[in-house]
Curated annotation (Swiss-Prot):
Binds 1 Mg(2+) ion per subunit. Its EC number is 2.7.1.71. This is Shikimate kinase. One of its GO terms (biological process) is amino acid biosynthetic process. It comes from Actinobacillus pleuropneumoniae serotype 5b (strain L20).
Amino acid sequence: MAEKRNIFLIGPMGAGKSTIGRQLAQMLGMEFIDSDAVIEERAGADIDWIFDLEGETGFRKREERIINELTQNQGVVLSTGGGSVLSKENRNVLSARGIVIYLETTVDKQFERTQRDKKRPLLQTENPRETLEALAKVRNPLYEEIADITLQTDEQSAKLVATHIIELIDNLQ
């Protein structure tokens, strides 16, 4: 990669965005930023608390401001929250300011990776698998809409996915 363009990772919860993002940033010598972590740091509270207090709408407004700010940086690998693509504004800034990588995963793998994670407010339901299926139905077309590259992450290590991303980005330029 001659120039260090921004790389934005999108996809559902449990796709590996944060893990792969850290690996990718390390391999490229770039800064890694997790938008959810920045939201929590700025709010002084975790996401489930923000959801409880402000609802999903309040959280999404925070997320929109943070993503707009973070995408103005140069040479970063940014991992976004699974629902960030619900905002047209987020989709626009992600598309305009970097290379968008959609990390795709099956609902089965998502469920396996997230079932013990209590920090996922949208999964604190009677039937989390059904919730994941409903989210996928709405969000997957939005991920596909803005993705420059799509990669399946189900049975691959973070290092292997990061290596594939680097190869594919090199081919884009």
